[in-house]
């Protein structure tokens, strides 16, 4: 059985992520222990709130360089995905720099912010994270900042303008939506991360 570890960023609804994996039959552990993080088979980097608070928490826990040096698959969720980029406009902040790109406030398109609720996700053909998930399936979003499409974009969503719904570089994967709150499609997405990503 794979060792799936949820990094305790102290700024996320960690229990809902854990329950999502529990429902799929996977054992997970929530921890900020460096040795456990480094020895995990798969890692989840969740986050809600501000980038500044999240980066400060990771710094206080001594986890920034630990995360940057990981070689196993890591899935960032919502703010956790944004933290994987170089920089955030929210607080003019350097982030984890796991892949190029920046996090910026979604443009004013006469739509309310935060972008909250169900929206369609369009993914690149044959990506293993989307195995058995219908094209343009709906996923659940809650965010005001996002990553505009770039070479690391695997899937997009549109909220007045297109933005990255999923990004990837090497072993680092990020989802702007909340798979743990996205019904059957979200459950399949988490299963695919565990089973299909090596």
From Swiss-Prot:
Domain named Glutamine amidotransferase type-1: residues: 3-198
Subunit structure: Heterodimer of HisH and HisF.
Any one GO cellular component localisation term in the record: cytoplasm
One Pfam family here: GATase
GO BP field: L-histidine biosynthetic process
Catalytic activity: 5-[(5-phospho-1-deoxy-D-ribulos-1-ylimino)methylamino]-1-(5-phospho-beta-D-ribosyl)imidazole-4-carboxamide + L-glutamine = D-erythro-1-(imidazol-4-yl)glycerol 3-phosphate + 5-amino-1-(5-phospho-beta-D-ribosyl)imidazole-4-carboxamide + L-glutamate + H(+); L-glutamine + H2O = L-glutamate + NH4(+)
Annotated compartments: Cytoplasm
PANTHER family: IMIDAZOLE GLYCEROL PHOSPHATE SYNTHASE SUBUNIT HISH
Biochemical pathway: Amino-acid biosynthesis; L-histidine biosynthesis; L-histidine from 5-phospho-alpha-D-ribose 1-diphosphate: step 5/9
Documented EC number(s): 4.3.2.10, 3.5.1.2
Protein name according to UniProt: Imidazole glycerol phosphate synthase subunit HisH
Entry-linked HAMAP family: HisH
Keyword annotations from UniProtKB, A to Z: Amino-acid biosynthesis, Cytoplasm, Glutamine amidotransferase, Histidine biosynthesis, Hydrolase, Lyase
Keyword Lyase: yes
Function description: IGPS catalyzes the conversion of PRFAR and glutamine to IGP, AICAR and glutamate. The HisH subunit catalyzes the hydrolysis of glutamine to glutamate and ammonia as part of the synthesis of IGP and AICAR. The resulting ammonia molecule is channeled to the active site of HisF.
